[in-house]
């Protein structure tokens, strides 16, 4: 199984609709590690790490998001595994503070 790490920027009505909580719940469900956080520009940023298939599924699911979200745009790109250092100790997936 091939492991990948992808950084994802999600734009639209994605703050104030439970997007971070939903992302964390879905990531845990699919066995994906990483983190999610709001950005001051109104977007949500996430880092997904796991099998190629699981990470691809997370990105696909983020295109719809939770019930009250409206996703206008998604960008994703590969990143180095050291980006995972922001995960809180003892957690596989973290919700980080806004930047």
Swiss-Prot record:
GO molecular function ontology, one term from the record: acylphosphatase activity
Keyword set includes Membrane: no
Protein name: Acylphosphatase
Protein's UniProt keywords contain Hydrolase: yes
Organism in which the protein naturally occurs: Nitrobacter winogradskyi (strain ATCC 25391 / DSM 10237 / CIP 104748 / NCIMB 11846 / Nb-255)
InterPro entries linked to this entry: Acylphosphatase (IPR020456), Acylphosphatase-like_dom (IPR001792), Acylphosphatase-like_dom_sf (IPR036046), Acylphosphatase_CS (IPR017968)
Family as reported in the entry's similarity comment: Belongs to the acylphosphatase family.
Catalyzed reactions per annotation: an acyl phosphate + H2O = a carboxylate + phosphate + H(+)
Residues annotated as catalytic: 20, 38
Keywords from the named record: Hydrolase
Top enzyme class: hydrolase
């Amino acid at each position: 199984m091939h492991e990948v790490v992808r950084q994802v920027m999600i734009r639209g009505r994605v703050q104030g609709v439970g997007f971070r909580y939903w992302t964390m719940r879905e990531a845990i469900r699919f066995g994906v590690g990483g983190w999610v956080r709001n950005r001051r520009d109104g977007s949500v940023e996430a880092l997904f790490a796991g099998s190629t298939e699981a990470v691809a599924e997370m990105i696909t699911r983020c295109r719809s998001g939770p019930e009250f979200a409206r996703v206008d745009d998604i960008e994703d790109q590969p990143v180095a595994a050291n980006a995972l250092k922001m995960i809180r100790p003892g957690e596989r997936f973290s919700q980080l503070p806004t930047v």
